[in-house]
């Protein structure tokens, strides 16, 4: 019985440890945002569209493929992720959303929201989770573990995939 309890506790702790970090408090973002997200892994490339908008006390994140078919929808309310709609859970999208929240946090609010964050010129990181290399404040590459990169740019009519 005790062995079963220990296994359950270990599973619970590992589930908590796998959650991507969130800011101490919600940063001030210029919402709504429409972004083109290019997912890159080894020699695979995939385009997504992301809409981030304020909804009440929370922030809604809607990820779609280029045809507008939903890939993932989440709401961040009171520093907790909540499913939005009937889509199944998508851990990769939740990790992406948390990384984007880190990348989009204004410089003046970064260390208050992410005390372990490091900055150097056009590079921002939160080891071991994410690294962000900025070309401009709205054009950047997110590097996540397992050789996964996301090139993020504002969505414009000219830049639509």
Region spans (language model):
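C-terminal motif of bacterial Sec signal peptides marking the signal peptidase cleavage site
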Residues: 12-15
């Amino acid at each position: 019985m005790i062995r079963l309890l220990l296994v359950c506790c270990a599973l619970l702790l590992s589930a908590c440890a796998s959650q991507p970090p969130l800011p101490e408090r919600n940063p001030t973002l210029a919402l709504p945002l429409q972004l083109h997200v290019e997912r890159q892994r080894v020699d695979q490339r995939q385009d997504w569209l992301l809409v981030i908008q304020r909804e009440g006390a929370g922030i809604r994140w809607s990820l779609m493929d280029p045809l507008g078919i939903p890939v993932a929808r989440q709401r961040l309310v009171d520093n907790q992720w909540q499913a939005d709609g009937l889509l199944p859970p998508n851990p990769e999208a939740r990790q992406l959303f948390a990384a984007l929240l880190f990348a989009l946090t204004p410089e003046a609010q970064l260390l208050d929201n992410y005390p372990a964050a490091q900055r150097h010129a056009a590079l921002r990181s939160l080891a071991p989770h994410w690294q962000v290399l900025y070309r401009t404040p709205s054009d950047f590459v997110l590097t996540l573990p397992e050789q996964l990169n996301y090139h993020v740019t504002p969505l414009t009519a000219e830049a639509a995939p």
